[in-house]
Amino acid sequence: DSIRKNQGKHEVEICVADDASTDGTWDWCLEMIDKDPLFKALKWDGPERVGHTILYDRLVNEIATKDICMIYHADMYLMPGALDQIEHKLRDKTIVSLTRIEPPLHPEGPEKMLMDFGIEPEEFKEKELLEWFKDVQLHQATKATEGIFAPWAFYKKDFQEINGHDPLYAPQSKEDSDIFNRFQLNGIKFIQTWGGCVYHMTCRGSRFADGAKRNPDGQVFMKNRETDEWLTQNQKATRNFIRKWGHFVKHDRFLKPIIPHKYDVGIVLNNNNTELLHALEPWCNTIYCGVGVNLRQQYITIEQPNTIMDLSKRVLPYNNEKNNEILVAINDKFTQQDFGYIQQLPEILANSGEEGEFELGNLNITVLSLNTYEKDLIKC
């Protein structure tokens, strides 16, 4: 309702994806299609959910007919004037994010405003929010920072130019950080408008399926309420992000991506420690391990269902020919500090700027070339 209430002069298509729901969502979509000629929807029948990583792209490519689209969450209330701000700031090769006004569900940050006008639709204080927001608009209409997060508005052509979200992360988690990196590498400028906002309520879905709770004092708490499904998928997606980019998700205080260089790294593991194999495999292009053929195949068999990357090409025997441009050799001794060095390797290599061989803790590092490959990741 908030989109229709507050869209102003703009003609807005609302495009919704139903991901194998069993709660009557599709019946509601059909009702809305009959009532609203600009309400459109697609249904994924399942039985397994494919997630918004896949369905956002189908909405953009198959359903939306406008040149400008916006990734928008169902738990957001569109504030008055938000679309005017997007119209004013969106230009070729830009993405505009609306500022989130949030109840205290998540850690505060400089890129959002924390104000509690309700955590669930049933307790939403709409009139109070709109009255408070008049002063915000008055003082922040021209304020803008760099950063990107939902909801974000973009030109469809810029989205399609990099082939949208990477299915590596399906059904969800880290797909947004991945596409933001790729947008930035492809020359997109990010703008966060503070005069255009949404109110963002409880994150309903796979992460907090049961919503938020308040204690007797009225304070909101979300800690330890994540579902097992979300925790498992988030771990898988994090490992896949590291496999692809060679580092954890990084951004500045306003959530603008920080993208270290991607190098061609091979790890040479001269022992039969399968736990170390599991920990180190995502942090390189190739790992040459001393475990026997049976243990190596066992690792591949167990881990392969968690990624679409071919692990048989990443996990190789210790004596295999080593063609990586950077080799990190590990013998029997390996500490948490050494693991930290591997996690920081892109920054260490960028700062060293030299080819050659050197020791770092218990690591022997051979640098044959410092070619970088992050721009090869722009298109998925």
Descriptions of predicted regions:
Residues 2-11, 279-286:
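Short, acidic, metal-binding catalytic loop of nucleotide-sugar glycosyltransferases
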